Amino acid sequence: MGYLVPTVIEQSSRGERAYDIYSRLLKDRIIMLTGPVEDGMANSIIAQLLFLDAQDNTKDIYLYVNTPGGSVSAGLAIVDTMNFIKSDVQTIVMGMAASMGTIIASSGTKGKRFMLPNAEYLIHQPMGGTGQGTQQTDMAIVAEQLLKTRKRLEQILADNSNRSLEQIHKDAERDHWMDAKETLEYGFIDEIMENNSLK
């Protein structure tokens, strides 16, 4: 079932202007990353990051994250763009950052990674499948690629936290859920945000 995107009316000297809520938030350099991470969503997030950086790369961008995760390639495209642009990217986790969402949220500018008190974090190893009727050699290729992907993602998580690569590998073996305090201790965020003190 779909949902209605709210419209915001603004008054100016030239009259009224209606914006959908996401366009209005973009004017304040706020990007909403919500729902599963997939190619279409990633392209939209990347375009918004590039637009805001081109508009003014001296101001922070605020990336609000609430996602169960999703595509590794789409998520890494977002992370690469966050690292590519000059603007600092503040990440604010609300609800949950799970799986690929953890990689994205923890890749915000160090010192500017936040989480709301009741949000959750999940790390685990990447998932993949070969499908029915896959040849044995193809299964071996997929398995090798999954191991390479896992190593790359674990290195990103280690770089974004205060944990060793070995600890990340051990913790990501199975679903590892963390509340805000545990996520702060782990080093994926820099502060638990009790109120909107970003601006």
Swiss-Prot record:
Cleaves peptides in various proteins in a process that requires ATP hydrolysis. Has a chymotrypsin-like activity. Plays a major role in the degradation of misfolded proteins. Fourteen ClpP subunits assemble into 2 heptameric rings which stack back to back to give a disk-like structure with a central cavity, resembling the structure of eukaryotic proteasomes. The active site is at S99 (nucleophile), H124. Signal peptide: none annotated. It comes from the Bacteria. This is ATP-dependent Clp protease proteolytic subunit. Its EC number is 3.4.21.92. The lineage of its organism: Bacteria, Bacillati, Bacillota, Bacilli, Lactobacillales. The keyword Iron does not apply. One of its GO terms (molecular function) is ATPase binding. It catalyses: Hydrolysis of proteins to small peptides in the presence of ATP and magnesium. alpha-casein is the usual test substrate. In the absence of ATP, only oligopeptides shorter than five residues are hydrolyzed (such as succinyl-Leu-Tyr-|-NHMec, and Leu-Tyr-Leu-|-Tyr-Trp, in which cleavage of the -Tyr-|-Leu- and -Tyr-|-Trp bonds also occurs). Pfam families: CLP_protease.
